[in-house]
Amino acid sequence: MKILLLGEHGQVSRELQLSLRGQGELIVRGRDRLDLSQPEQIRQQLRELRPELIINAAAHTAVDQAESEAQLAFAINATAPGILAEEAAALGAPLIHYSSDYVFDGTKNAPYAEDDVPNPLGVYGRSKLAGEQAIQAVGGAHLILRTSWVYSLHGRNFLLTMQRLLQERDSLNVVADQVGAPTWAGSIADATRQLVERWRHGHAGPWGLYHLSAQGEVSWFGFASAIAEQLRAQGKATATLQPIPSSAYPTPARRPLNSRLDCTRLQRDWHVQLSDWHSALLECLHSPR
């Protein structure tokens, strides 16, 4: 089987390149070889490569930066997924695409289910929602996987930022009123591998929209505290953490206060096993990846 994986150097893609070994011929493309802001380039490459499965792990993920470059964010996060869906449908190839908890406004007092009405707060969330809708409008075989608070040992993310700041500073303020599930990119890749294997062996669940995040919930402050605990276990000095409200840390893009996602549907329909956020953090920190 020929698999096309987009987003070569991204957090999820890097983990997928490990998890999908043995699943077939894996063709990986980054922005240098397939620019998702160029529609004709997308069409040309897919028609030349003719993959049997397309996994789109590429995205414009700079949430604050998106506020000042909406056109680029929509080109990559909205227009490109629609084109990928069209080309995938023409090839008869399923499309797996990753979306975000930021399609919601965070006002619900419980975890969000797939059929809750989206209401994004910023450009990034609006562009991701538009990408979902573009894929759904095509109507081909697809999985849209909304995830949350992605981190890994690569790239730019909360885990790596906290590890650095906790050792550089004496005191550190961290937002405590945003709650969600930090999700290791390795866990997303492992869940994706489970989905691919079930599809390949004829045990696929229904195509469509699903939530995929770590189990459990924690605030950014709680997540930072868990990271600090692991650093101290290694004998490293860490900053004193202070909880603050979101209002004390203004950013160009507003964040939802509730980013919790209900993953029951994915577990029920596809029998995917998901780790809790704290176990996944420990696995990530001790991973040879």
Mark where each language-model region is.
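N-terminal Rossmann NAD(P)H-binding glycine-rich loop of SDR-like oxidoreductase domains
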Residues: I3-S19
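SDR active-site strand-loop-helix element
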Residues: L6, R29, A57-A58, L95-S100, ...
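Adenosine-cofactor binding site in Rossmann-like domains, unifying the SAM/SAH pocket
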Residues: R21-Q44
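NAD(P)H-binding glycine-rich loop region in Rossmannoid oxidoreductase-like domains
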Residues: P39-I76
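Catalytic helix-loop patch of NAD(P)-dependent Rossmann-fold dehydrogenases
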Residues: S68, A75, A80-I83, A90, ...
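NAD(P)-dependent short-chain dehydrogenase/reductase
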Residues: Q133-A181, G186-Q194
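Mid/C-terminal beta-alpha module of Rossmann-like enzyme folds, strongest
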Residues: A191-T192, R198-P252
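Amphipathic terminal alpha-helices
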Residues: S275-R289
